[in-house]
């Protein structure tokens, strides 16, 4: 049987942070801190595969908080994600990390939903921050990026932008912050036939 390309129909948003005084070179924050961030995000038992940032229209209205679907997670499964995640070491002058994912939806000239796009945001801070700073910076930069996605394609905004963010004030040697969309259910487009 021939299948067309696969696209997600259900997604969830999540986020997590991690920090540690231990790690392995060359990027010590990529080991223990990243694992802790995945655990807090409740996606630690998936094999993570990153996506770029195009969303099918079937996801509109079908992006839920992670807690609504975590009981259905399958240990060892592949989880395709759009993720903004980075780590840092305080010795390099970073004392806080903010991350975020934003979503925009576009419409055609008749006002019909076409689909959407996501944007990722990561920012390093030399001092500790609070949630208000993390949220305002995430929205500022994601709004700019999402509008660029629409303008690049000459597409009109269909609905309000959506934003998800996270941050960490690093109290140990290393820290990691992530914000992600994970994709769970899928359908297939019609197969392509060449005549």
Curated annotation (Swiss-Prot):
Pfam families: PvlArgDC. The keyword Repeat does not apply. Its main location: cytoplasm. Trimer of an alpha-beta dimer. This is Pyruvoyl-dependent arginine decarboxylase AaxB. Its EC number is 4.1.1.19. One of its GO terms (cellular component) is cytoplasm. Keywords: Cytoplasm, Decarboxylase, Lyase, Pyruvate, Virulence. It comes from the Bacteria.
């Amino acid at each position: 049987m021939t299948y067309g390309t696969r696209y997600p129909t259900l997604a969830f948003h999540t986020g997590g942070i991690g920090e540690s005084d231990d790690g392995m070179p060359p990027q010590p924050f990529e080991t223990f801190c990243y694992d802790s961030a995945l655990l807090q995000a409740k996606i630690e038992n998936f094999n993570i595969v990153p996506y770029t940032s195009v969303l099918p229209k079937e996801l509109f209205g079908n992006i839920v908080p992670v807690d609504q679907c975590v009981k259905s997670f399958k240990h060892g499964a592949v989880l395709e994600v759009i993720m903004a995640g980075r780590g840092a070491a305080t010795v390099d002058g970073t004392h806080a990390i903010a991350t975020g994912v934003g979503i925009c939806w576009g419409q055609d000239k008749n006002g019909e939903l076409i689909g959407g796009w996501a944007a990722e945001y990561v920012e390093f801070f030399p001092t500790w921050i609070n949630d208000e700073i993390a949220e305002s910076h995430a929205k500022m930069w994601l709004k700019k990026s999402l509008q660029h996605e629409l303008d690049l394609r000459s597409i009109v905004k269909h609905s309000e932008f959506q934003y998800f963010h996270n941050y960490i004030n690093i109290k140990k040697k290393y820290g990691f912050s992530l914000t992600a969309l994970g994709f769970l259910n899928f359908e297939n487009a019609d197969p392509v036939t060449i005549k």
